[in-house]
Amino acid sequence: MPDVASNSMVDHIHTTLDWVGMSEIHLPARVSDTLAGERPVSTSIQAYVNLANADAKGIHMSRLFLMLEETFGDHSVSAGSIEQLLRNFLQTHEGLSTRGFVQLDFEYSMRRAALKSSYSGWKSYPVSIKGTLCEDGMRIELSVEVPYSSTCPCSAALSRQLIQEQFRKDFEESKVDTDAVLEWLGTEEGILATPHSQRSIAQVRVLLDHNVGDAFPITALIDSIEGALKTPVQTAVKRVDEQEFALLNGQNLMFCEDAARRLKTALNPQSCYKDFWLRVNHLESLHAHNAVAIVTKEVEGGYLPIP
């Protein structure tokens, strides 16, 4: 059969292309975590090579697809298996391509304990693993999205002001009695205002050493993010857990700038991450828009703070 990818009766413009390949390839795979071990995941994959030969009509997409099935059907997803996959991409496109790329997107489920009670529940985190093989060598990147709660410091201050004003109004004509104040604090009339809070998303991408080994630090990275922010979204809760969550929100008032600084401070000293890019998104409940902050590790030649 004729090789239409290399020869075609239809004239074409002679030029190179940055990437050619496929997206939305759905394959089952196995991913190993440094703390939780290996588990199956359902992935959506992108796979590309560049077209460096300006005279070539196109690439051999079926070869990429078959190598994906072969690699992740027989091997767990690791830095080593990704690098071998990309080298196979280039070997089967010799004379056509000099760079290869693959990205695996999947939901990573973790069982999370409640804050106070014995309850626990499953929580799902969007995760991406990217591999790029080019003239400069191999790059392995890990990305996660972590939901958390953020309470507005300005709104909290305004709420306190309203409560103070109401307290003065209700008690200005009488001698303050401790029991009366305690009772007043437990009423809706007393605590007549609460600060607005919202579900927020931290998007974090880290550059790993390509010799990271067979397991990825997915759980470790998520734990670092949640530990820095202090207010991760919960799963199953009892009233005691909800009360503790309210306390944590009150103790960790955050603008998006505050959240970004916390994460940068937490990730900077971790040498396992050669570089990082992070974006925090506060899905405002007061406004119809989101509040966003972006920061990088500021490594020379590293990630740019591009939204």
UniProtKB/Swiss-Prot annotation:
Q: What is its EC number?
A: 3.5.4.16
GO MF annotations in UniProt: GTP cyclohydrolase I activity
Q: What keywords sit in the KW lines?
A: Hydrolase
> What's a single GO BP term from this record?
tetrahydrofolate biosynthetic process
Q: In which pathway does it act?
A: Cofactor biosynthesis; 7,8-dihydroneopterin triphosphate biosynthesis; 7,8-dihydroneopterin triphosphate from GTP: step 1/1
Q: Where are the transmembrane segments?
A: none
Q: Which reaction does it catalyse?
A: GTP + H2O = 7,8-dihydroneopterin 3'-triphosphate + formate + H(+)
Question: Which Pfam family, any one, appears in the UniProt record?
Answer: GCHY-1
Site (May be catalytically important) residue list = 152
- Extract the Gene3D superfamilies matched here: Urate Oxidase (3.10.270.10)
Q: What does this protein do?
A: Converts GTP to 7,8-dihydroneopterin triphosphate.
Family of the protein in this entry: Belongs to the GTP cyclohydrolase IV family.
Q: What is this protein called?
A: GTP cyclohydrolase FolE2
Species of the source: Alcanivorax borkumensis (strain ATCC 700651 / DSM 11573 / NCIMB 13689 / SK2)
